[in-house]
Design a protein with these regions (language model features):
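N-terminal export/assembly segments and adjacent metallocofactor-ligating motifs
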Residues: 1-328, 334, 601-607, 611-835, ...
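Domain-level signature for respiratory redox metalloenzymes
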Residues: 234-241, 273, 277, 281, ...
Length: 987
């Protein structure tokens, strides 16, 4: 059996070496000292006293008699026709922030958007979401949002701003002075039309698109190879073999929500299927995608180009063609080439490189493998990335030369995330006319002379074409909370046109989209149907012929074949899965979401290989100085390539709300070229120690057989491979299993489908009002997440296998937590749910101590203003402010200080589903009720249902030979089970 470990400390020193106490062991002075660490001393309160007294039953009973103030709800006097109190309304819409896109449903309660769900009708995202999509609803209630137009620090009325802007635009137009409209990639047909009209009226305005995480190399390579600029449509669900060079396509590359669904579709083993795709990842840093690979080859960034050139040589050699350069043979690459060749037309090679030469060679490899038209489509393109890096470089040159006299920015922050951000900042200060059109403050808007604040996307109308002929609409779920106006409406207003952008969209659709269909006799019917569904995906036949236009590949191969003689450390920058390029740095849900691989939150850090750390005598938490420019804490990451280090971008924001300000370090400026890495990096140990908020060692289950796995070949021979002990444990008891006459709710997690992305965790937080506790409390193991995604390493610490496992309350039918609660606050329902009576809980924490799965969470403070006692409040992210409390789900009780909470299997959704079925006089249908984690999951890894329904999908999965329960040997009889992880080690 494999040995599984969560950290290098655990691997080397054993289970008990890893701290897991929410409070430290020791004498009274040591215990009290934790309250003073990093905080001002404060008076003890009643809960502190109970903590130190072991929460005796007698004292707790006395304290529980305290009363809270009464708060009254105010009903509607005249109910709006479309609103029924207590019933949610859903609006089909779209999430679009920079390069992130998702077709969504907005859930509103009494006019408040409170939750984002995926749109199952979308042919792009297919109902899946990401952690950023789920967390975006909280940004609507961000207290740092701009609330009105401004000139400098002076508040303006919109009429005053419009007059000022028109005057400046006309002045610059008459003088024929250049103005730049700087935006992120725009893939809204109507917005593009508005911008084109704006430029037609002001011909001195030049439109430039800028992406901080750009796909410029892909776009240029496709134009060079096929004569069509753009990003190809990748189909991982058609690929039997995938080779990825540093492309984190499950984490941050292009469109992860779509990629995850496609990728896991080829990894599911159900309905008798025994075939899986084979995935090889060649990379420097252990990424989310690399963590899911069947085989991973750690290499330095400088070595990857040579390996790609070698792979191309091997492929054309197999094709019987003449090779361009004589390169050193690599055994791994030769075998990969043979495996790819045996999967011609059903393979896919991708690269995350920003080097155009690399992308040209990758295109050539895929063309030789006959993948175009199958796993790759040039005629169907991804439109969320359009920017050309050279355009932004030209803008900076024009600013510095004085040629550029005006700038209008929308949705970008180059002062922070552009490589030459400091130069951009200095040049921007010299421009007379500068106008920002953003919803929140950032480093760039702070330097602009004028501000026209934009709406949040949940307050906006828009349309999108994320992929060729895949259209979607955005509609608001609430009226603007502040005195803001959409970017498009502002442009229309400055043109002297009707500023109603909705009318503009409808006119554009009637002219361009309506003729693409024949199902609806008039535009009104077509529009209403499309608005209701949120998408329009016409069938349009492609006429593009994919021909590879480059005939001489010699220069490209030679460019890649140059061996970089770099023996020093190389630095690689990567995009954070949680906060991306920094646009969502002020979102506390995302800041507190642990990185899927390192399990660290509230910081960025320097990933160092175990061998490098040993040589330099570094440990996790040591602070190093990088090239005498920035200081960063070290994290020793298993699987990190030797002589390489990596750090996430998006951190170190200086101008934003209180949540994201000064969290981590900005490293964007370190990369001063188009290369993907920085060579010859010097690290100097400072002697300082930094506390990282790391959750990977919290809530340990003491090294027992938690993850079960097997190889594909073993599984084909024996479907119970890796799960042989299940049958013995399943029938070990002499007692009869509990019976539930009506429903018995349960859940299955397919470990083959779970990639560890974290969407489920944020969805649960949004649905169930799970509080944010802040970095200091996370360090104390006080985090509150109801569902954690455990990450396990196994094998060699220098290149380990990785397993992800979502763990929530297991809803045991023989629950150890229930019989130790002195007041029966936790008990079992008649439908198999382990439920909590919050107002009965007195906070002894006996249940948490007795839970073998460590899934119960204790409220050390009042994080969401659940009671009226000021001393109980602990507000790290303004979550107690009334504006942010608008995001709370009224169907879920907010918990007060001193109360235990945990996963309820979304009992509020179960009750709603049962009531709907009762009203309609029928039984609950299988799949009708979905938990928040299940609905958010882009891979469909979670299945919820009724264990009493023998025809349900859940029961079919629990009947699988791969099905097992956590810690079956202690006979807790969980209602949550798992399907063993199967790895395809050979193609």
């Amino acid at each position: 059996m494999n040995k599984y470990w969560k950290s290098l400390t655990e691997l080397k020193n054993g289970e008990n070496s890893v701290p897991d106490q929410a409070m430290p062991k020791g004498n009274l002075e040591q215990i009290l000292d934790i309250f003073d660490k990093n905080e001002n001393a404060s008076k003890s309160n009643r809960r502190d006293f109970l903590k130190l007294c072991g929460f005796s039953l007698a004292i707790s009973t006395v304290v529980a008699s305290c009363e809270n103030s009464v708060q009254k709800a105010i009903p509607y006097l005249i109910k709006p026709e479309e609103v029924t109190p207590g019933k949610a309304n859903y609006y089909a819409s779209s999430f679009a922030k920079g390069n992130d896109y998702c077709s969504i449903l907005i859930k509103t309660r009494e006019g408040r958007p409170i939750k984002i769900e995926g749109n199952d009708l979308s042919g792009v995202t297919h109902g899946g979401t990401s952690s950023r999509v789920q967390a975006s609803v909280l940004d609507l209630y961000d207290t740092s949002r701009y609330k009105h137009p401004k000139k400098g620090n002076q508040k303006l009325a919109w009429e005053e701003l419009d007059e000022t802007v028109k005057k400046e635009l006309n002045r610059l137009k008459n003088a024929n002075e250049q103005v730049v409209l700087l935006t992120s990639s725009i893939y809204s047909p109507s917005t593009i039309s508005v911008i084109q009209k704006f430029i037609a009226q002001y011909p001195n305005v030049k439109w430039v698109q800028y992406d901080s995480q750009s796909a410029s190399a892909l776009i240029q390579a496709n134009e060079m190879c096929f004569g069509k600029a753009g990003v190809s449509d990748y189909r991982f669900d058609y690929a039997d073999m995938i080779v990825s060079f540093d492309s984190d396509f499950l984490g941050t590359w292009l469109m992860p929500v779509e990629h995850i669904r496609q990728y896991t579709k080829k990894r599911k083993l159900c309905n008798g299927n025994t075939s899986m795709s084979h995935h090889i990842q060649i990379e420097s840093r252990l990424s989310l995608t690399g963590s899911n690979a069947d085989k991973r080859i750690p290499v330095k960034p400088s070595e990857q180009n040579l390996l790609i050139a070698q792979l191309y040589n091997e492929i054309i050699k197999l094709a019987g063609k003449e090779i361009y350069s004589v390169l050193e043979n690599n055994t791994d690459i030769q075998q990969i080439a043979k495996d790819l060749w045996s999967h011609k037309g059903k393979s896919l090679v991708v690269s995350g490189s920003k080097d155009t030469n690399v992308q040209v060679i990758v295109n050539a490899i895929n063309f030789e493998l006959e993948n175009y038209g199958s796993t790759l489509r040039v005629d169907k393109q991804l439109h969320t990335f359009k920017a050309n890096d050279s355009d932004m470089d030209q803008v900076l040159k024009d600013m510095k030369s004085g040629k550029l006299k005006g700038i209008i920015s929308y949705g970008v922050n180059p002062v922070f995330d552009y490589q030459q951000g400091k130069e951009f900042s200095d040049a921007l200060k010299k421009i007379d006319f500068s106008l920002a059109m953003d919803e929140v403050p950032n480093e760039t808007t702070a330097l602009m002379s004028l501000l026209a604040p934009d709406n949040h996307f949940l307050e906006s109308w828009n349309d999108f074409e994320p992929k060729t002929n895949r259209y979607s609409l955005m509609q608001p779920g609430i009226r603007p909370l502040f005195d803001t106006r959409q970017f498009q409406s502002s442009l229309l207003s400055w043109m002297g046109e009707d500023s109603n952008y909705l009318n503009f969209i409808k006119n554009n659709w009637e002219k361009n989209m309506y003729p693409m269909q024949a199902a609806y006799p008039n535009f009104t019917t077509f529009w209403n149907h499309t608005l209701q569904q949120g998408i329009f995906e016409p069938s349009v036949k492609s006429v593009f012929d994919t021909k590879f236009s480059l005939t001489n590949m010699n220069s490209f191969v030679n460019q890649l074949a140059k061996q970089v003689d770099n023996k020093d450390i190389e630095l690689q920058l990567y995009e954070s899965i949680a906060i991306g390029d920094g646009k969502m740095a002020n979102n506390p849900w995302l800041q507190e979401m642990p990185d899927p691989v390192t399990k660290i939150c509230w910081d960025n850090y320097l990933c160092v290989s175990p061998k490098q750390a040993e040589e330099m005598m570094l440990e996790t938490g040591d602070v190093v100085e990088l090239n005498s420019q920035v200081k960063l804490p070290v994290y020793v990451l298993p699987g990190q390539a030797y002589n390489t280090v990596a750090v996430a971008t998006g951190y170190g924001r200086q101008v934003c709300g209180i949540v994201g300000k000064n969290v981590g370090v900005n490293v964007n400026f370190l990369l001063q070229s188009d290369d993907d890495f920085i060579g010859d990096v010097k690290l100097a140990k400072t002697g300082e120690i930094y506390d990282l908020a790391m959750t990977q060692t919290h809530h340990s289950m003491e090294g027992r057989a938690i993850v079960r796995e097997a190889g594909l070949e073993e599984y084909k021979k024996n479907p119970s491979a890796g799960n042989e002990s299940h049958h013995a444990y399943e029938n070990a008891s002499i007692y009869e299993k509990p019976k539930f006459p009506n429903h018995h709710w349960g859940l299955v997690v397919d470990l083959n489908s779970c990639v560890g992305c974290g969407a489920c965790s944020i969805a649960c937080q949004s649905e169930n009002n799970v509080p944010v506790v802040g970095k200091k409390e996370v360090i104390r193991a006080h985090e509150m997440s109801w569902i954690r995604i455990d990450r396990y390493f196994s094998g060699d610490e220098f290149n380990p296998d990785v397993s992800f496992q979502p763990v929530m309350c297991q809803h045991c039918d023989n629950a150890p937590c229930e019989n130790v609660c002195p007041v029966a606050a936790t008990n079992h329902s008649s439908e198999g749910l382990n439920q909590m009576a919050y107002n009965r809980c007195i906070g002894t924490r006996y249940c948490g101590n007795n839970c073998p799965y460590k899934v119960r969470r204790f409220n050390w403070f009042d994080y969401t203003k659940a009671d009226s006692i000021p001393n109980n409040l602990h507000d790290v992210a303004e979550m107690t402010i009334d504006l942010k409390r608008m995001v709370l789900n009224p169907d879920v009780t907010i918990r007060a200080k001193g109360v235990i909470e945990k996963c309820s299997l979304c009992v509020q959704r179960i009750q709603e589903g049962k009531l709907n079925a009762k009203i309609e006089g029928r039984k609950v249908k299988d799949g009708e009720i979905k938990t928040a984690c299940q609905q958010a999951c882009p891979s469909g890894a979670i299945i919820f249902g009724d264990l009493n329904d023998k025809e349900s999908k859940l029961v079919k999965e629990t009947s699988s030979k791969r099905n097992y329960h956590l810690l079956e040997e202690i006979h807790t009889l969980p209602s949550v089970s798992y399907l063993t992880k199967i790895r395809n080690k050979k193609a």
